From Swiss-Prot:
One of its GO terms (cellular component) is cytosolic small ribosomal subunit. Keywords: Cytoplasm, Translation regulation. Required for dimerization of active 70S ribosomes into 100S ribosomes in stationary phase; 100S ribosomes are translationally inactive and sometimes present during exponential growth. GO terms for molecular function: ribosomal small subunit binding. It comes from Bradyrhizobium diazoefficiens (strain JCM 10833 / BCRC 13528 / IAM 13628 / NBRC 14792 / USDA 110). Belongs to the HPF/YfiA ribosome-associated protein family. Long HPF subfamily. This is Ribosome hibernation promotion factor. One of its GO terms (biological process) is negative regulation of translational elongation. NCBIfam families: yfiA.
Amino acid sequence: MTLRISGKSVSVGEALRGRVSDRTEEVLRKYFDGNYSGHITLSKDGFGFRTDCALHLDSGITLEADSNAPDAYASADQALVMIEKRLKRYKSRLKDRSARKAHVASAALAAMDATSYVLEAPGEGEDEDEVTGYSPVIIAEATTSLKQLSVSEAVMELDLSGAPCLVFQHGSSGRVNIIYRRADGNVGWVDPPGGKADGKAGG
């Protein structure tokens, strides 16, 4: 179990580091009894402080949250409150998932590998009316593993992570699916080919 707590243009003293570490342990142990790792970064943001929190549970779930506040302690507390609220929402399902570690391990072995890229965004020229001949430049590349999940499990992971979208391998069909947050607050679901798209996310 490794939790890194660091500062970006901020000195993180032992008192703050201890407070954040203890609070993280308290939040996670309420709803999860397995191991975890992660990184919590505190940084200066204007006249206040920002906390970026990413925690990885050994069940395969990633929790992410960020918060801004005038005080570094308050900023960290608020980020962990966000994570606690998400964990509380899925308390029973998280415990069930933790009890199925063997199933999770076998699913990980069968997971599909995919290559992910970061592309350079087109420039924002003030005097340009049209972008022509744009050829995106790959600035980063990595291999990621697409989890085998039901749609309901994918929605849970999307909500817990706070991410805008999630790409996964459908546990029943084996197809690559996408769920994403819609502007109306609902979750869109894309299931190609010939599947449901933008429908109600079910099991």
